Regions:
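Short alpha-helix
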Residues: 179-195
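Class I SAM-dependent methyltransferase SAM/SAH-binding core
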Residues: 59-115
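Short, glycine-/aromatic-enriched active-site segment of Class I SAM-dependent methyltransferases
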Residues: 161-178
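A short glycine-rich, Lys/Arg-flanked "PGG" loop and its adjoining helix->strand segment in the class I
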Residues: 139-151
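Conserved SAM-binding loop and adjacent beta-strand
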Residues: 27-47
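A short SAM/SAH-binding and catalytic strip from SAM-dependent methyltransferases
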Residues: 125-138
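Conserved beta-strand signature within the Rossmann-like core of class I S-adenosyl-L-methionine
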Residues: 153-159
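A short acidic, Gly/Pro-enriched loop at the edge of an enzyme's catalytic core
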Residues: 114-125
């Protein structure tokens, strides 16, 4: 087969990718395992820009397989919450962090970013790894995040994709997943519309951790309530 390696070629690959929007069933289970592994370097890089205090209360939106919840449990002595709208993601995150849940240090909740099941002014930090692509309305959903943040609280966004003109694979992913990819300037604009300030971004270009031929732009954005 002589097709470009950067194109999405097989139906199996397409089915797996489509499942990334909301993991379900056996494919979703497999995908979450792959995400836990493939996003690790990105997450480490992103978190290196985040100052976490021992008493910070943290919410991870779109917690997926739960590895970032597990990470934060080692960085704060306070409770860590994970939220996802995928049933299987909630199940996997719960299994991974069961000991902390039993100790009362962790909660994994099924829910949507558009209607967070938390009181106003609850969290010091809300994190979003590889998930804002799928938020129904980024500005309004960011306002909902701001609602549950304490005064001076932080929203942290970590993405491995930025808009890349002429990238055929990215275009296919956008079409397949109905996803939205934002630049640092767009994040700045939309987060300000949502009421955030002190917005800073960090970018890093490098090979994708799974495909050495695919170069992506890593982007971390931090803003304050």
């Amino acid at each position: 087969m002589s097709e470009n390696k950067e194109n999405i070629r097989t139906q199996e690959e397409k089915d797996l990718i489509i499942n990334a929007r909301k993991p379900e069933g056996e494919l979703g289970d497999q995908l979450l395992d792959r995400m836990n592994e493939s996003h690790e370097k990105l997450a480490q890089w992103g978190v290196s820009h985040l100052d976490i205090e021992k008493d910070d209360l943290i919410l991870d939106i779109g917690c997926g397989g739960g590895v970032n919840v597990e990470r934060f449990l080692k960085m704060t002595e306070n409770k860590v919450y994970g939220l996802d709208y995928s049933d299987i993601a909630v199940e996997k995150s719960t299994r991974l962090n069961q000991d902390a849940i039993d100790e009362g240090r962790c909660e994994i909740i099924h829910g949507s970013v558009s209607e967070l099941p938390f009181e106003d002014n609850s969290f010091d930090i809300v994190t979003c790894f590889e998930t804002v692509y799928f938020w129904p309305d980024f500005v309004n959903d960011s306002k909902e995040v701001r609602r549950v943040l304490k005064d001076d609280g932080i929203i942290f966004i970590c993405n491995e994709a930025i808009p890349t003109e002429g990238d055929q694979r990215q275009k296919e992913l956008i079409d397949l997943l109905e996803m939205k990819i934002y630049s640092d300037d767009q994040f700045d604009q939309f987060l300000r519309e949502a009421g955030f300030s002190d917005i800073i971004s960090f970018s890093k270009d490098g090979p994708d951790s799974l495909d050495k031929e695919l170069v992506t732009g890593w982007l971390t954005v931090i803003a304050r309530k």
